């Protein structure tokens, strides 16, 4: 495993999970996903040095997520595989094609450790569920705060009202993260 801080590294902090897609008259299909995980994957596919600070288990789903990410060059930060189980987003597709979602989430990512004297990441990206779901949201905010002066900070709110809790509290978190960011999607 590596640690964040290689020159030109993109550090993405956020959820990696399994989308369980259920269609009428078909067996459920597991697909590795998560908005921040997909950003790390896209950066790696573009040839960028990408690290993902996430929270997955060592269960079969977690192993599938790790394998999926590592196949394209994404590295997980130390401690990212500490969850008791890997989170899921179950999408049930109705006969009309509309989806309904049920989330089973655990979000307690480790603070990404750095080697003494290591260069800060060029880019720090977060968003979606990771930025708002306690207790891990506090780690996300600390990472953005700590790297704000040395890295380009990118934030994608990707608002999901059903997961964000009380609107005023969620809005306050989003506003703090926007203020820490150089780029907001």
Label every model-predicted segment.
Residues 5, 119, 179:
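Structured loop/turn residues at beta-strand edges in well-structured enzyme cores
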Residues 26-42:
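Short catalytic helix/loop segments, enriched in acidic residues and glycine
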Residues 20, 48-133, 149, 153:
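Conserved N-terminal subdomain of the carbohydrate kinase-like
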Residues 1-23:
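Positively charged, low-complexity intrinsically disordered leader regions
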Residues 34-35, 61, 139:
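Conserved alpha-helical elements of sugar-nucleotide-dependent glycosyltransferases
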Residues 14, 54-56, 157:
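Short beta-strand/turn micro-motifs composed of small residues
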Residues 123-185:
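Conserved beta-alpha-beta core of the PfkB/ribokinase-like small-molecule kinase fold
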């Amino acid at each position: 495993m590596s640690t964040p801080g290689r020159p030109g590294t993109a550090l993405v902090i956020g959820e990696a999970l399994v989308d369980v897609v259920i269609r009428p008259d078909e067996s459920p299909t597991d697909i590795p996903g998560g908005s921040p995980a997909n950003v790390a994957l896209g950066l790696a596919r573009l040839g960028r040095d990408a690290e993902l600070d996430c929270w997955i288990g060592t269960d079969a789903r977690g192993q599938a997520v790790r394998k999926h990410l590592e196949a394209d060059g994404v590295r997980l930060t130390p401690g990212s595989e500490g969850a008791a189980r890997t989170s899921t987003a179950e999408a049930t597709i109705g006969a009309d094609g509309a989806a309904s979602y049920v989330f089973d989430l655990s979000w307690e990512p480790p603070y990404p450790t750095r080697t003494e004297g290591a260069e800060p990441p060029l880019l720090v990206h977060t968003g979606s569920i990771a930025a708002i779901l306690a207790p891990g949201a506090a780690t996300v905010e600390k990472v953005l705060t700590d790297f704000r002066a040395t890295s380009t900070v990118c934030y994608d709110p990707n608002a999901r009202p059903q997961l964000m809790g009380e609107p005023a509290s969620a809005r306050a978190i989003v506003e703090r993260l926007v203020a820490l960011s150089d780029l907001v999607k």
